[in-house]
Design a protein with these regions (language model features):
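Core catalytic lobe of class I
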Residues: 1-245
């Protein structure tokens, strides 16, 4: 197996009407232990190049946040997994809450674990994103440097570098990109010549519902990035909790 992507049942939130179900344990400690036993088996069948992505939310009990994701994260590392990233899934459309005495939570954790820190597969190019428009416009401006005071020399305002030096720098960039000084941002992105950057570790992805489907489905956008970056072409992805989405 090349990769695991899953979202296990959250602690003490839903009753799936199954005997011995995960998520209905008496304590958080027992819940985390049962979860880790599942991922012990994933670790066993995963290739040395493999990754394991786990989305898990937290639970309140008697006005206390139980810190389920943090407990799970530490327990996984104690059992031989290596944590590469902790992604924040920020939801612009979170579920309403009835509580009147706390902030409205709109995020969940998405952990990226690897089996071997020296061998894991990662395709960085698959998840590069375009630079922001304001950053791109700096490359095409005649002189975009902010005026700033040089407190080491005097109180006079000046440029960090000369406009001539900056023009030459950006001229080289434009030449390498094969783009004229006048440009349209949308057209630049379509051309495939837009400068890129690595994806951030906070992802703004709306939650979704599908008529007739499982009531806790993945937004396709949420798992697209992990699969594109961590699973080789024609690779095998497993979800031990049989999630749909």
């Amino acid at each position: 197996v090349d990769m695991c992507v899953t979202s296990p049942p959250y602690y003490n939130l839903r009753d799936y009407k199954n005997s011995g179900q995960i998520g209905a344990e008496n304590t958080v400690k027992d819940f985390v232990e049962n979860l880790c036993k599942v991922f012990d088996e994933i670790h066993r069948i995963l290739k040395p190049t493999g990754s394991c992505w786990v989305n898990i939310g937290d639970t309140y009990d008697k006005k206390r946040l139980l810190q389920v994701p943090s407990r799970f994260e530490i327990a996984m590392c104690d059992r031989g997994w290596h944590l590469r990233n902790e992604i924040i899934w920020s939801k612009p459309n979170p579920q309403p809450i009835s509580s009147k005495d706390r902030f409205w939570g709109n995020h969940e954790k998405f952990f990226w674990f690897v089996k071997d820190v020296k061998k894991y597969y990662f395709n960085r190019d698959a998840i590069l994103v375009p630079q922001a428009e304001i950053s791109i416009r700096r490359m095409f401006s005649k002189n975009n440097m902010e005026k700033r005071k040089d407190f080491n020399a005097s109180d006079k305002e000046g440029f960090a570098i000369s406009s001539n030096s900056q023009d030459k720098h950006y001229a080289r960039m434009r030449e390498e990109m094969g783009i004229d000084k006048e440009f349209n941002y949308e057209e630049l992105i379509k051309s495939g010549k837009c400068p890129t950057r690595p994806e951030f570790d906070t992802w703004n992805v709306p939650s979704v519902t599908y008529k007739g489907a499982h009531f806790a489905v993945y937004p396709p956008e949420l798992i697209e990035k992990p699969i594109l970056s961590c699973c080789p072409e024609q690779g095998i992805v497993i979800d031990p909790f049989m999630g749909s989405g």
